[in-house]
């Protein structure tokens, strides 16, 4: 009942069809896009559930002990990462797939920048399963924060805050 109410609310609010699924398997099998953003220590779905043509964005599991994607997901996918060296060191699920021998580091097809600049091919055909594995790049976060800050200042938005310990203690709810 809660899931149906939430689906109705989301449909109304965003003007898209939202409907509850009976299982993670059903959800994954019926999705063109699967996004995971978890701190899970074990896979949240099975790669065998993915249909041809699906895109997976795995943006969690950003530490060696975490694993939101299974080896089968990596094995079946064209793998793209944000920054190869960092992802190979930090993405627990990718590291697990490599250490289990399901894939090798050479199976990482490209960095996202290589696809954007045309140095590497993206999706080769409509049946290919693609996977973007991201652990985040701090310099991109800083650049984004600086851009947002500059835009807010230019538009007179936001509020000044002191960041000393006393101010922070007094502002706690």
Language model segments and positions:
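Active-site catalytic pocket residues across diverse enzymes, especially alpha/beta-hydrolases
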Residues: 10, 48, 152
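A short helix-to-beta-strand connector/capping loop
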Residues: 14-18, 125-127
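Rossmann-like adenosine-cofactor binding region
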Residues: 16-102
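NAD(P)-binding Rossmann-fold cofactor-contacting core
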Residues: 1-14
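Adenosine-phosphate binding glycine-rich loop
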Residues: 66-171
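Anionic, Ser/Thr-rich low-complexity intrinsically disordered regions
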Residues: 33, 171-172
